[in-house]
Amino acid sequence: MKIQNPMSIYEKLNILSDAAKYDVACTSSGTKRKGDGSGMGNCTQCGICHSFSADGRCISLLKILFTNECIFDCKYCVNRRSNDVVRTSFTPDEVCTLTMEFYRRNYIEGLFLSSGILVSPDYTMELICATLYKLRKECNFQGYIHVKAIPGASQELIQKAGFLADRMSVNLELPTAEGLKLLAPHKSRKNILAPMRLIQEG
């Protein structure tokens, strides 16, 4: 693992928006063209993507991971434990700051938040819940939030996040138990399907 000096929030944003691009949720242009200073506008690679609201509108979302650290070593994942990449994590305050500042500038209409597994599924889900609570209750953010449920986290934490988010989903890693055992031996089919059922039941 590459060790870095303390990072700025912008450096974290570059890493954790890039790490989120593999999370299925929405589409993005993928352009990296920067403004030359002679006009207006700037297409940076930081994770603004597009999704569709219930009424069919195309909306812009800040798409980030809370952390790219992970205790698992899934063979297909760029954030797997054994991959030698720069690791970092946001704090709940940093996610709130980014979301609110992007929203005030009319860059986004909402947030897409996923995460690697830091320490444990429950610990990670607690951090996500703390972030969503702060956004909704302290920052009074009423925009759209799509959050990924963390497989293996407790039912109570998943329900808590569900009350604060507009949409929840779970990454279905592989279609068969055999494939999951081969490519993601630390994960279980039961832990993936349990939050999916919970979300489906509302």
Go through each PLM region and give its residues:
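Conserved, mostly hydrophobic/aromatic
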Residues: 61, 74, 113, 170
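Short acidic, glycine/Ser/Thr-rich loop/turn "cap" segments at secondary-structure junctions
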Residues: 79-85, 111-121, 145, 180
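Conserved AdoMet/S-adenosylmethionine-binding subsite of the radical SAM
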Residues: 96, 119-202
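Canonical Radical SAM [4Fe-4S] cluster-binding loop centered on the CxxxCxxC motif
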Residues: 64-93
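Flexible, acidic/Gly-rich N-terminal and inter-domain linker regions that tether
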Residues: 1-69
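Short Fe-S-cluster ligation motifs
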Residues: 98-114
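Short, surface-exposed acidic/glycine-rich loop or hinge patches that mediate macromolecular interfaces
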Residues: 64, 69, 118, 151-152
